[in-house]
């Protein structure tokens, strides 16, 4: 009876999430349709009335936030209803190992509810809950989308770990901040996660993921987070008993790499493949042993020191952490009717991260054609000791009877500089050259934490420019991001990613965006080159209350 009740509750919960997904999608379509009709067909007076009505459209604030805060003194309530839809521009076809019979990359609706209760001036309890549903997995005939069979969180959130996103108690004074509970910590400011490494990440969007997504895609952990403020120096210490691994775009996800064997037909009908117990060589893969909070030796620890001297701020970081992705170590051999095979044990190994960051702001005067030009310079770097890489060269030797475990350790470095310019007419320009390096790299080496992809080094000079349209009172904004990817000594150019975004502030509560993303250049086995048929357009709508 209890099991039947639980199934009924689960069924109702899924139906509610489906309804939430459809609601977000319809709301998005309605708002964009109304805006289009208003701009193109309606008289100015009609559009003005529509805008005035939309400016005060805040049912969540009126009927939820304000009502609850009146009933419970000391309670603060806020929320966000967001919807993202991304559609492929190329036709349905098999690409590499992928059965790409779908044309929707995501159709996600996310409801975020944030509650905070202030016990006193210094003491506050905060809860942030996430309710997500991705309708892309409901599309009929999509044999290529089956990741929800492996992990249902790709489709919707229903367990405590995902729904209870953050839950912490904070005590703050002018000299001390102490936050205990489940939380995310953002140490970096740049696109590329250079020192932003405290939390694992949900990488379901693969190369489409950008800095604007980090707040939503980080995976919070249970920890104690304390900061002490001196006059011009602050010391931040993290004690983290918890461990969370990365979520990667594996089999059956829209962004599963076309280079990842075997084909989808093999995987989606095999429990061994769905559970990750076998590979294309027929090897046996054991259960992954994760760090556990009950073992003090498994806990993680991080320290950050920041200092300020006028317009210059700088910081040093150290993080004694675990790998976010397990490396498959060879631990045995066996034979069957198909031949000799290996026994692999995925393990998370310890890492030592050493990082540095700096910011400097100034105004360049007398710039020709510009006048005064505000500039911000940023730098971030992370050096990682003993990152684990799958070593396919050694793995081949082991298969031939040689020694080794198929994994090798390499130090890695990733660093970036950013130059931010605030030109007249509110034009913002950012140039961010980014660099990734794997020490002692050789042919046949896979990927590892912080290292280059497919080569010894990678170089990605990111260029960003944005400008508002003044005729819309700066409510309409356009931006362009260009990310070419170079590497050496072998691959050279690995392709480029181009992102064009047009956003509009419908009201103080509602924002919408249209996004075009293009992947071009490089070879079919390169970082961006493999996704050259994943060009897409996206629509985003966000309502905050």
Show where each model-derived region lies:
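N-terminal periplasmic/intermembrane-space "pro-region" immediately following the signal or transit peptide
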Residues: 2-4, 8, 17, 34-128, ...
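Residues that define the transmembrane beta-barrel architecture of outer-membrane proteins
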Residues: 73, 87, 103-111, 160-165, ...
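Repeated loop/turn-to-beta-strand initiation elements of outer-membrane beta-barrel proteins
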Residues: 75, 123-125, 175-178, 232-235, ...
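Transmembrane beta-strands of outer-membrane beta-barrel pores
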Residues: 83-89, 131-135, 173, 184-186, ...
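Detector for outer-membrane/organellar transmembrane beta-barrel domains
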Residues: 104-106, 321, 359-486
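Residues on the lipid-exposed face of transmembrane beta-strands in outer-membrane beta-barrel proteins
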Residues: 111-117, 127, 166-171, 224-228, ...
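Outer membrane beta-barrel
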Residues: 122-265, 310, 516-517, 521
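Outer-membrane beta-barrel "beta-signal"
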Residues: 206, 531-545
């Amino acid at each position: 009876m209890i099991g039947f009740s639980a199934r009924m509750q689960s069924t109702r919960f899924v139906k509610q999430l489906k309804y939430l997904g459809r609601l977000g999608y319809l709301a998005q379509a309605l708002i964009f349709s109304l805006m289009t009709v208003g701009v193109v067909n309606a008289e100015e007076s009609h559009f003005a009335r529509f805008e005035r009505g939309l400016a005060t459209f805040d049912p969540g604030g009126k009927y939820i936030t304000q009502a609850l805060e009146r009933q419970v003194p000391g309670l603060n309530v806020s929320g966000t209803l967001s919807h993202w839809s991304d559609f492929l521009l190329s036709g349905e076809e098999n690409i590499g190992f992928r059965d790409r019979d779908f044309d929707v990359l995501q159709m996600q609706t996310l409801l975020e509810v944030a509650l905070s209760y202030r016990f006193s001036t210094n003491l506050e309890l905060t809860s942030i809950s996430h309710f997500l549903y991705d309708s892309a997995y409901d599309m009929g005939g999509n044999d290529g989308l089956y990741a929800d069979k492996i992990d249902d969180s790709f489709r919707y959130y229903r367990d405590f770990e995902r729904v209870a996103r953050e839950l912490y108690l904070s005590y703050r004074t002018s000299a001390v901040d102490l936050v205990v509970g489940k939380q995310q910590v953002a140490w970096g400011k740049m696109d590329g996660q250079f020192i932003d490494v405290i939390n694992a990440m949900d990488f379901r969007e693969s190369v489409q993921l950008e800095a604007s997504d980090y707040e939503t895609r980080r995976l919070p952990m249970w920890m104690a987070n304390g900061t002490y403020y001196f006059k011009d120096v602050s010391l931040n210490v993290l004690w983290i008993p918890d461990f969370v691994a990365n979520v990667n775009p594996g089999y059956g996800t829209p962004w599963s790499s076309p280079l990842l064997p075997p084909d989808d037909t093999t995987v989606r009908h095999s429990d061994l493949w769905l559970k990750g117990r076998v590979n294309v060589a027929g090897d046996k893969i054991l259960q992954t042993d994760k760090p556990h909070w009950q073992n003090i030796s498994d806990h993680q620890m991080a320290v950050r020191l920041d200092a300020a001297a006028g317009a210059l701020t700088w910081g040093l970081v150290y993080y004694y952490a675990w790998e976010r992705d397990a490396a498959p170590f060879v631990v045995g051999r066996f034979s069957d009717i198909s031949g000799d095979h290996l026994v692999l044990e995925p393990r998370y190994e310890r890492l030592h991260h050493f990082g540095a960051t700096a910011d400097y702001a100034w105004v360049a005067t007398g710039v020709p054609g510009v006048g005064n030009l505000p500039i911000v310079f940023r730098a971030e770097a992370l050096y990682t000791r003993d990152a684990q890489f799958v070593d396919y060269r050694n793995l081949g030797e082991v298969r031939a009877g040689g020694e080794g475990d198929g994994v090798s350790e390499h130090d890695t470095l990733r660093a970036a500089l950013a130059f931010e310019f605030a030109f007249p007419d509110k034009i913002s320009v950012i140039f961010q050259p980014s660099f990734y390096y794997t020490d002692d790299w050789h042919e046949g080496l896979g990927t590892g934490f912080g290292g280059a992809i497919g080569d010894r080094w990678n170089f990605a000079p990111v260029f960003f420019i944005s400008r508002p349209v003044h005729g819309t009172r700066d409510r309409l904004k356009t931006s362009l991001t260009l990310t070419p990817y170079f590497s050496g000594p072998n691959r050279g150019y690995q392709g480029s990613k181009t992102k064009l975004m047009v956003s509009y502030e419908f009201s103080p509560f509602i924002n919408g965006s249209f996004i075009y993303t293009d992947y071009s250049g490089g070879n079919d086995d390169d970082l961006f080159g493999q996704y050259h048929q994943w060009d897409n357009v996206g629509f985003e709508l966000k309502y905050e209350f």
